[in-house]
Amino acid sequence: MSTLERIDPEIADVICEEEKRQRGKLELIASENFVSEAVREAQGSVLTNKYAEGYPGKRYYGGCEFVDMAERLAQERAKKLFDAEYANVQPHSGSQANMAIFFAVLQPGDTVLGMDLRQGGHLTHGSPVSFSGKLYNVVSYGVRKDTEQIDFDQVARLAREHRPKLIIAGASAYPRIIDFARFGQIAKEIAAYLMVDMAHIAGLVCSGLHPSPVPHADFVTSTTHKTLRGPRGGLILSHSNYTRLLDSQIFPGIQGGPLMHVIAAKAVAFREALQPSFKEYQQRVVADAAALAQELKALGYRLVSGGTDNHLMLVDLTPQGVTGRVAEETLDKAGITVNKNSIPFDQQKPQVTSGIRIGTPALATRGILPHHMKAVAGFMHRGLKSAGDEPALARLRAEVAEFCSAFPLFS
């Protein structure tokens, strides 16, 4: 019996059941992944006990000599990984990294140009329910109806018309390569700051499988999980002339003590991402996504923009007469985890949606390869066709669990 089982059997049971879920189901949520045992070990270490307000060498607490070493390693590895002059590894999340940029260069009421949430953007890019939409004047761009790819003519027109102080590039549900150089040109034309949120594609960027935003943006933010396959957390990259401005916005601006156990885990993840094997992993992620997209199209599914260039795709279920919410619930019963997602120009409410977003980072981590995507697409197709048929879904769930057992986790 473990210490946790003895002290708190209820939480121990929750963790046990969640591990079973992760082992036995196909994880197709594009923003989820499985960290290495080394990352988990660092995050569960004694570093969780240490307060360390401030930055290495400039702390407000004593006894920080070793956590200073951990944070410096994380900073240097992040800079090397993305060829950046500056890295702040303290943000607790991608949203807080974004908030720090807003607070650093904007005043309440300033104009921001960001991607519409319902066309692929993120809550923190100007949604009215987010701080970004509540404190600032937000103008939103989207995608073209014919290609379902970013409408750069619209971006340029809105930029010239509204003269935003900050332009945001990056997305949470966009399956194509983003032209950061073009965003940079538009921002320079109107003397705006450019912030790129690369949370979803950071792993692809550091592996050379997606163009880097670092040369074109004033600020780059990211999460450290998703394709980067680290602990849940945030990251800011920038140029050295912004060091004091950005450091002060994270602490004491919006955060107090950093999570040193998470920062150590970030350092481990960055070291893993610097290895040649990580690029090979990212190549599998992209190859898996391309193969899965092809198999789904062969089964009659319409993909937003016609396919994918990265790790994710959006499936429009309108032709199948199924909502995203029903698809998410049905596939979960079949042992397949996805999330409902709005598609461009969606007529359904955000709680319902016409589509699902799926991705392959977690599949590739398990060792599931492109030639397995025919089976994965087949499982999805059978699940969606079995909506409401509980016995059929139960049988399919058993098949999916058997399939997953060939690709063990946490070995």
From Swiss-Prot:
GO terms for biological process: glycine biosynthetic process from serine; tetrahydrofolate interconversion. It is found in: Cytoplasm. SUPFAM superfamilies: PLP-dependent transferases. GO terms for molecular function: glycine hydroxymethyltransferase activity; pyridoxal phosphate binding. The record marks 225 as: Plays an important role in substrate specificity. Pathway: One-carbon metabolism; tetrahydrofolate interconversion; Amino-acid biosynthesis; glycine biosynthesis; glycine from L-serine: step 1/1. It catalyses: (6R)-5,10-methylene-5,6,7,8-tetrahydrofolate + glycine + H2O = (6S)-5,6,7,8-tetrahydrofolate + L-serine. Its EC number is 2.1.2.1. Belongs to the SHMT family. Homodimer. This is Serine hydroxymethyltransferase. It comes from Syntrophobacter fumaroxidans (strain DSM 10017 / MPOB). The lineage of its organism: Bacteria, Pseudomonadati, Thermodesulfobacteriota, Syntrophobacteria, Syntrophobacterales.
